[in-house]
Structures are given as C-alpha cells and as structure tokens.
C-alpha cells in the first residue's frame, strides 16, 4: 500500500522585526533634512544612515542592506529616479519611498516612479509621522 502524501506545510509568516533591527537610508541633497530625519528616526529606534547624493547612496547600498530607503526625487547629478533604478540592481530587496518637493506639478514623474516599483511617495514639507507611518506600512514590526 502506498503512503499518504504529506500535506504541504502552511507558509510561515515572517516574524515582525523590532525597530532596532530595521535599517533605514535617507537620501537627499539637503544636508539639514537628512540630519534631521536621521535624528528623528534614530530617536524612534530605527537604525538610520544618510547619503547626500545618489552616488553616495549606491556606494552605501553596496556595502550594507537597508530595509527601506527614503529617496529625494530632485537631486543634482543622479536624480532620484535614476538612483532608484540603480539601487534596484545594486541592492534588490530594499523598499523605496520617494520624497518630493514637486507636489502635484510633476504627476508624470510620480506615476513613473510608482510604475517602476516605488512603494510610496511623500510630498515635502512632511511631518515625521508620515515617515514613520510609511515604515510601519511597508515593514510590519513588533514594537
């Protein structure tokens, strides 16, 4: 007599991460903004680093994994969309949230970013709770 096939195991849900395990990279050419975001996110318990250009972000992403990247759209040199595409090649698995001061004027840029896989878009000026809410929506965590 043949054996009964084993039932497939139910897929395991990923354990929620602790805030202290979530790595965040903030990329913006406005140094005051990146420093303020780093200070605020670190105070919330997230491991946070900054980069002030797309090139610097790519270098950091090749050296370390980031769970989430907050990326400014309008930067000199490599802009946010170019950086996003290259980040996808250099560091797949990082969720990207675009930050833009363009508001509604460049709807096409926002639509292109979303079509490429950007998880969310946040308009400047923003409140820190918009940033922390984006993190919670993208990466569920325990605390």
What is the role of each PLM region?
Residues 99-101:
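Hydrophobic/aromatic residues positioned on beta-strands within the core alpha/beta folds
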Residues 65-70:
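Active-site beta3 strand of CheY-like receiver
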Residues 52-56, 79-83:
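Acidic catalytic/metal-coordinating carboxylates
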Residues 75:
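Receiver (REC) domain active-site loop signature in two-component systems and cognate sites
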Residues 82, 103-122, 133:
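Alpha4 helix (beta4-alpha4-beta5 surface) of REC/receiver domains from two-component response regulators
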Residues 31-49, 116:
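Two-component/phosphorelay signaling modules centered on CheY-like receiver
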Residues 62-64, 87-94, 116:
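Conserved phosphotransfer cores of two-component systems
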Residues 1-23, 129-143:
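Non-catalytic signal-transmission and effector/linker regions of two-component phosphorelay proteins
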């Amino acid at each position: 007599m043949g054996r009964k096939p084993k039932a497939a195991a139910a897929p395991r849900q990923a354990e929620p991460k602790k805030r202290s395990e979530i790595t965040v990279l903030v990329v913006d050419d406005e140094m005051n903004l990146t420093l303020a975001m780093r200070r605020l996110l670190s105070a919330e318990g997230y491991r946070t680093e900054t980069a002030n250009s797309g090139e610097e972000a790519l270098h950091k992403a090749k050296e370390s994994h980031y769970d989430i990247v907050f990326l400014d759209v309008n930067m000199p040199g490599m802009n946010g969309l170019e950086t996003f595409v290259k980040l996808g090649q250099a560091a797949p698995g990082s969720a990207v949230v675009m930050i833009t001061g363009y508001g509604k004027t460049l709807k096409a840029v926002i639509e292109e970013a979303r079509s490429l896989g950007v998880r969310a878009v946040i308009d400047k000026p923003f409140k820190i709770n918009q940033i922390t809410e984006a993190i919670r929506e993208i990466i569920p965590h325990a605390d």
